[in-house]
C-alpha cells in the first residue's frame, strides 16, 4: 500500500484506485495488523435491531469506538448489556466501508470488576422484585416426603456426590439428575432449560415426575455464580410448577435464584437435609405418636370403666329399694283389714240391736259382698287407698308437729308459768309472782324472781298439745 502512495506522488501514469478498492485495502490492513483485541470501556448507545444484532459504543474519557455483536453471540451473553456498564469486550477490529469508519465486532462481553456486577445485580433484583417474583405469598410448602427428587447441577464434582450421599444416609429416594454447566457461557441457558424440562414431565409417565427440585452448585466468586443471577434462571424457578430448593454457593453467597426459590439452603448438603427427614427418626416419631394415640384412646376407656364399676357398686339392689315399700304396704293392708273387721263387727252389733227387714238385710249383704269382692279382686284399689291414707296421715303428722307447743322447746326456747300453771308472757307479770316455773325440753325448773322470798314450789301439770286428747283418733271416723 505504501508503494501505491509513493507512485501517486511521482505523478506518473499509474491508474487511480476506486473508493471501494481503497476501503477494502484499509479493511485488510486493519484486520491483519490488529486481529483480536480486548478493550475495557463503558457501554453507550446500546440498541438491539429487529434482526437481533446489537449495536453499541465503547468509550472512555478520551475516545469512542463503535461496536457490533451479531445475533448468535448476543443470545449467549451472560448478562443484559445496558448503558453505563463498564465491560471488557473481546472482538476483532475491522472497518465498515459503507461509512468509512472502523469498529469492533464483539465476540464476548464480561463485566469489568465486582463493583459493576454488584450494581447490575442490585438493579436486576429491584426490577424483578417489583414484578412480585420474590413475594412471600408465592412461596410453596415443600413436600414432607418426596418420592422423586430432581437435581439440577454439574454431573461431576463434589456437589452431586454430597447430595446423593446425604440423601442415602437420611431417607433413600429416587433421584433424577439433569446435568448442566454451572458457570460460564451457556450455563444460564442450560440451568433454566433443565428447570423447565423437569416441570414439563407428565405425571404417571415412564419417567417419574419429581416432587421436589434442588438447583445446586458449589461456592465461588460472584463471576462464577453469575449464571444463577441471570433473569432467565430466576424466571424459570419462579414459573416452576414443582417446589424448588436453591443451594448455590456457600452460606455467605446469595444469588437471585435464592430469592425466587421456595426455600434457600446454605449449602448443597443442607439442601438434601431439608429435602427429606431422617428415616430412623421418622420411624421413632411415628412409633411415639402411635403409642401416645393408643394411650389417649385406652386411658379414657379405663377411667370410664372404673367410674362405672364404682357407681354400680354404690347403686342399691332392687330388693333393697322395694323392701321398705313392701313393708309399708303390708302394714297398711293389715291396718285396712283390721279397720274393715272392726267396721263389720260394729255393723253386726248395730244390726243385732235393731229390727231390720229381710230386704234391708239382703241389700246390706249384697253391698258387703260387693265390697268384699272389690277388696279381694282389686288389690290395686287397696294399695291406692293405703297410699292415700298414708299421705293423709303424713300431712296430719306435719300439721301436728307444727302446732305442738313443745316444738320450740326442742329448738332452745323455754315456757315460763306462774304458781297456778298459767303462762307468763311479759316481764311485768313475772315480777309480780313469788315463784315461777321455767319449762325446758327435758324438764322444769322452779325459780324465784329477784327480790322475792322463796315460796313453796307447786307442781305444774303439763298440758297436752293442742288438738290432742287422751283417746286415739279413729282413722275411719
From Swiss-Prot:
Q: Which keywords does UniProt give here?
A: Cytoplasm, Exonuclease, Hydrolase, Nuclease
GO CC terms, sorted:
cytoplasm; exodeoxyribonuclease VII complex
What is its subcellular localisation?
Cytoplasm
EC number, UniProt record = 3.1.11.6
Chief place of localization: cytoplasm
Give the span(s) annotated as Disordered.
452-477
| GO process terms (BP) | DNA catabolic process
Q: Could you give a GO molecular-function term held by this entry? A: exodeoxyribonuclease VII activity
Highest taxon, organism lineage? Bacteria
Q: Tell me the function of this protein.
A: Bidirectionally degrades single-stranded DNA into large acid-insoluble oligonucleotides, which are then degraded further into small acid-soluble oligonucleotides.
Regarding protein family, the annotation reads: Belongs to the XseA family.
Output this protein's name: Exodeoxyribonuclease 7 large subunit
Q: Which organism is it from?
A: Erythrobacter litoralis (strain HTCC2594)
Amino acid at each position: 500500500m505504501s508503494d501505491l502512495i509513493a507512485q501517486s506522488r511521482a505523478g506518473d501514469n499509474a491508474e487511480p484506485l476506486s473508493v471501494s478498492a481503497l476501503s477494502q485495502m484499509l479493511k485488510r490492513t486493519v484486520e491483519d495488523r490488529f486481529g483480536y483485541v480486548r478493550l475495557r470501556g463503558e457501554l453507550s448507545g446500546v440498541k438491539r435491531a429487529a434482526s437481533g444484532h446489537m449495536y453499541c459504543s465503547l468509550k472512555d474519557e478520551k475516545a469512542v469506538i463503535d461496536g457490533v455483536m451479531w445475533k448468535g453471540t448476543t443470545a449467549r451473553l451472560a448478562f443484559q448489556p445496558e448503558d453505563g456498564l463498564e465491560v471488557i469486550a473481546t472482538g476483532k477490529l475491522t472497518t465498515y466501508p459503507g461509512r468509512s469508519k472502523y469498529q469492533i465486532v464483539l465476540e464476548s462481553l464480561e463485566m469489568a470488576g465486582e463493583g459493576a456486577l454488584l450494581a447490575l445485580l442490585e438493579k436486576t433484583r429491584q426490577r424483578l422484585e417489583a414484578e412480585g417474583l420474590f413475594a412471600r405469598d408465592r412461596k410453596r410448602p415443600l413436600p414432607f416426603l418426596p418420592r422423586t427428587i430432581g437435581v439440577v447441577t454439574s454431573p461431576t464434582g463434589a456437589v452431586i456426590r454430597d447430595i446423593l450421599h446425604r440423601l442415602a444416609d437420611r431417607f433413600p429416594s429416587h433421584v433424577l439428575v439433569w446435568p448442566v454447566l454451572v458457570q460460564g457461557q451457556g450455563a444460564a441457558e442450560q440451568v433454566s432449560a433443565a428447570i423447565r424440562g423437569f416441570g414439563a414431565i407428565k405425571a404417571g409417565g415412564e419417567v417419574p415426575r419429581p416432587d421436589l427440585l434442588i438447583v445446586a452448585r458449589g461456592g465461588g466468586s460472584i463471576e462464577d455464580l453469575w449464571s444463577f443471577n441471570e433473569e432467565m434462571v430466576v424466571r424459570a424457578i419462579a414459573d416452576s410448577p414443582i417446589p424448588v430448593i436453591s443451594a448455590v454457593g456457600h452460606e455467605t453467597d446469595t444469588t437471585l435464584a435464592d430469592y425466587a426459590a421456595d426455600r434457600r439452603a446454605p449449602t448443597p448438603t443442607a439442601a438434601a437435609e431439608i429435602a427429606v427427614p431422617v428415616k430412623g427418626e421418622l420411624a421413632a416419631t411415628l412409633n411415639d405418636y402411635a403409642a401416645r394415640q393408643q394411650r389417649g384412646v385406652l386411658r379414657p376407656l379405663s377411667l370410664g370403666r372404673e367410674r362405672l364399676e364404682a357407681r354400680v357398686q354404690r347403686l342399691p339392689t332392687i330388693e333393697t329399694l322395694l323392701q321398705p315399700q313392701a313393708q309399708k304396704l303390708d302394714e297398711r293392708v293389715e291396718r285396712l283389714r283390721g279397720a274393715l273387721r272392726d267396721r263389720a263387727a260394729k255393723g253386726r252389733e248395730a244390726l243385732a240391736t235393731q229390727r231390720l227387714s229381710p230386704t234391708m238385710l239382703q241389700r246390706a249383704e249384697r253391698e258387703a259382698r260387693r265390697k268384699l269382692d272389690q277388696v279381694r279382686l282389686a288389690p290395686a284399689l287397696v294399695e291406692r287407698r293405703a297410699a292415700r291414707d298414708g299421705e293423709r296421715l303424713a300431712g296430719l303428722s306435719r300439721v301436728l308437729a307444727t302446732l305442738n307447743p313443745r316444738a320450740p322447746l326442742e329448738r332452745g326456747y323455754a315456757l315460763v308459768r306462774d304458781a297456778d300453771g298459767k303462762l307468763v308472757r311479759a316481764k311485768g307479770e313475772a315480777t309480780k309472782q313469788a315463784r315461777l316455773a321455767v319449762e325446758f325440753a327435758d324438764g322444769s325448773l322452779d325459780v324465784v324472781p329477784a327480790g322475792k322470798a322463796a315460796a313453796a314450789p307447786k307442781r305444774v301439770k303439763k298440758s297436752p298439745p293442742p288438738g290432742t286428747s287422751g283417746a286415739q283418733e279413729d282413722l275411719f271416723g
